[in-house]
Amino acid sequence: MKMELKVKPIENGTVIDHISGSKALKVYKILNIEEKLPITLALNVPSKKGVMKDILKIEGLELTKDDVNKIALISPDATINIIKEGKVIKKFKVDLPKRIDGIIKCTNPNCITNKENIEGKFSIEQKNTLKIRCEYCEKFINSIIISK
């Protein structure tokens, strides 16, 4: 007998869908979600396209522009659904901007941003295989450290 698990839809909040498989916990951590908010997390769920995806549902959360940029860095194919009174009022795919300020930390220990209290500034050089360049030291980074 085939068993199904039904998850109650959220009334007001955000659903982050099509998160790359096994990356929802990373998305959860970088969003610094309040512990009291009801959260539903689904890991490695088969999508209609036949690939594995994660889903994160957060009741009562409205994402900021920085939040969406952080999600795009971790899972560039994610989709955001804004829910009001049980209905999707807005749906969009995340998209990396050309430049990201303040949310990434440079991995170069000699970069001025690691020696002084300066916010990191990065150019997105390539989106499909993520390539990011620090605007201070010019170093290309491939391991992302979210700073806040």
From Swiss-Prot:
Cofactor binding notes: Binds 1 zinc ion per subunit.
Keyword Nucleus: no
UniProt entry keywords in alphabetical sequence: Metal-binding, Pyrimidine biosynthesis, Zinc
GO molecular function annotations of the record: metal ion binding
One BP term from GO: 'de novo' pyrimidine nucleobase biosynthetic process
Gene Ontology cellular-component terms listed: aspartate carbamoyltransferase complex
Cofactor(s), by name: Zn(2+)
InterPro entries in UniProt: Asp_carbamoyltransf_reg_N, Asp_carbamoylTrfase_reg, Asp_carbamoyltrfase_reg_C, Asp_carbatrfase_reg_C_sf, Asp_carbatrfase_reg_N_sf
Pfam families: PyrI, PyrI_C
Residues engaged in binding Zn(2+): C106, C111, C134, C137
NCBIfam families xref list: ATCase_reg (TIGR00240)
PANTHER family hit by this protein: ASPARTATE CARBAMOYLTRANSFERASE REGULATORY CHAIN (PTHR35805:SF1)
Biological role: Involved in allosteric regulation of aspartate carbamoyltransferase.
Subunit structure: Contains catalytic and regulatory chains.
Entry similarity comment: Belongs to the PyrI family.
Protein name, UniProt field: Aspartate carbamoyltransferase regulatory chain
Source organism of this protein record: Methanococcus maripaludis (strain C5 / ATCC BAA-1333)
